[in-house]
Amino acid sequence: AESLIYLAFLSSHRVANNVPLISLGAQQAIIRTEIERDDRTLNIDLEINASKANRARINGNPTRSQREILGACQIVYFSPEDLDLVRGEPGGRRDFLDRLLITRTPRMAGVIADYERVVKQRNALLKTRSSASALLPWNEQLIKFGAQLTADRIALVEALNPWVTKNYANLNEVKPASISYKCSSEGVSNNFENNVEVLTKRLEEVAYQEIERGVSLIGPHRDDLHLQIGDFPAKGYASHGESWSMAISLRIGSFNLLKSEGSEPILILDDVFAELDTSRRKQLMSATQIAEQTIITTAVESDLPAELLTQKFYV
């Protein structure tokens, strides 16, 4: 399951770098996949390296960038770590949005990578108290990539929200649930041109503060996905059961959204059934009925509902 997730996002959902994914003493790991879609067969090889850039091949032909394989394997996964989407820090929720963005629109991987590169370089300049003229080209790039990323994230949240609300209600929860985009810059929207204006103005307003603190204070790297249950934010107020319901609703809602737009993502349920009560297990099971392909992993076979024990592989 983890190899498919890596193939879909070019990063692991469990570890921060490639080293733990490679066998001790080896120089690289290789994922080989055959994907059949729209009467076409794609053979994708991805070489994962610990100390240099990954390399990819499509039908034996080297790609210029590993990002060219994004979109070939669409994944929605649910794992025990998803409880952190509700209880954890904003970075995890931003990562959730960005991975769904990449699945929905693969070209956004380039925008996200460019934005992260700009923020890193800009922060390095701010720490050295560089002049305004040195910061100017990086400000322009932060505005350009930040405006696009913010617009696409907001559009994604607007499209995902009804599915989250519906799935949460299907879990027989009494309080309604919703999601919204919490931005560090007031006035942004799903419109790129509007966001360029907003970010330009906000950067001017915080220019002195940024130099004093040595860090970029404005942009989507400071934003959050707000999760609401009833009258209160889920983080800090949701019960253990409500937190699981919200996590399930986010993941199954993601699957519903992609499917409604014509995609057929693979649904991966990674060792989660032991964590769930009967009603939440049933909600996950209902999702497997509409998925073209579902992969379920578990360390303990008895954790799985009997209805799902169709074809088993032991690893």
PLM feature spans:
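Long, non-coiled-coil amphipathic alpha-helical linker/lever segments
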Residues: 17-18, 97, 104-153
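A short helix-turn-beta junction within AAA+ P-loop NTPase domains corresponding to the substrate/partner-engaging
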Residues: 307-315
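Walker B catalytic acidic pair
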Residues: 270-272
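Pre-Walker A-like glycine/lysine-rich segment at the N-terminus of P-loop NTPase domains
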Residues: 1-6
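Nucleotide-state sensing region of NTPase/ATPase domains
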Residues: 8-92, 98-108, 161-166, 195, ...
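Conserved NTPase motor "head" modules and their coupling/switch loops across ABC/AAA+ ATPases, GTPases
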Residues: 18, 132-266, 275-279, 283-286, ...
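Structural recognition of the conserved hydrophobic beta-strand(s) that form the central parallel beta-sheet
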Residues: 33, 293-299
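Hydrophobic positions in the central parallel beta-sheet of the AAA+
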Residues: 78, 265-268
